[in-house]
Amino acid sequence: MNWKRVHQIVAGLVFLVALGVYFATVAPTASFWDCGEFIAIAYKLEVSHPPGAPFYMLIGRLFSMFAAPENAAFAINLVSVVSSALTVLLTHLIVVQLVERWQGGAKETWQHLAALAGGVVGSLAFAFSDAFWFNAVEAEVYAISMFFTALVVWLMMRWSRLAREEEAALQGQERHPFGLQANRYLVLIAYLFGLAIGVHLLNLLAIFFCGLIFFWDEYDREDYTTMQRF
């Protein structure tokens, strides 16, 4: 069985389920709190309350350009719909990677099924949680902020896997810690952090996750004591 294709199909179905549910429940116009403000600044390219959300504003403006003026609020709400559905997709991929890494690499049929089941259950449980669903159907920065966070986490885990594979291929040869081809993902992650702060500063918290993953893969050893790690 072509498990790569199966994984792609399941991930696609998870994305479509989330997208369909969010689209069916999206707010037709402005919701409470900051939503009206974000719709206005995106449509008119104006300035929001500090610290601002310039990248969100530009994306919202792009979506509103394909809608009639009376449907601008609905079009900008769709930014959250699409971003949240992509976040659910990335959550599925992250859980699958975590399960496969815990398994030491999925080789048997039951291992693939376990990884897929974990990804589907985890991502859909997250998708239909109250707080996430609430932000997925209105014009708020939190949906696209979560997308950036999930994307950075997934890219960092992908870097970790590819870096380990490259290190194994080197067979113990000396190399510079930044000398792997997989490190292009680190450059992309740094770029995404720059974009993400144009949405919400909360995304910067993912830097600690990236730093720990880099430390564990590059400098940590199984025989290290706690003092040696610090």
Task: Cite the ranges covered by each PLM segment.
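Transmembrane-helix motifs of polytopic, lipid-linked glycan transferases
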Residues: 12, 78-108, 151-158
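Membrane-interface transmembrane helices that cradle and orient dolichyl/undecaprenyl
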Residues: 107-113, 152-186, 193, 212-229
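Aromatic- and kink-enriched transmembrane "portal" helix at the membrane-lumen/periplasm boundary
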Residues: 23-24, 69-77, 102-112, 122-146, ...
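Short hydrophobic/aromatic helix or loop-helix immediately within or flanking a transmembrane segment
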Residues: 42-74, 81-82, 89
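Transmembrane-embedded, aromatic-rich helix segments that form part
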Residues: 148, 202-215
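Membrane-water interface at transmembrane helix exits
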Residues: 21, 26, 60, 64, ...
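Start-transfer (signal-anchor) and selected internal transmembrane alpha helices
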Residues: 1-21, 96-97, 103, 108, ...
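Transmembrane signal-anchor helices characteristic of membrane glycosylation enzymes that use polyprenol
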Residues: 5-32, 126-128, 200
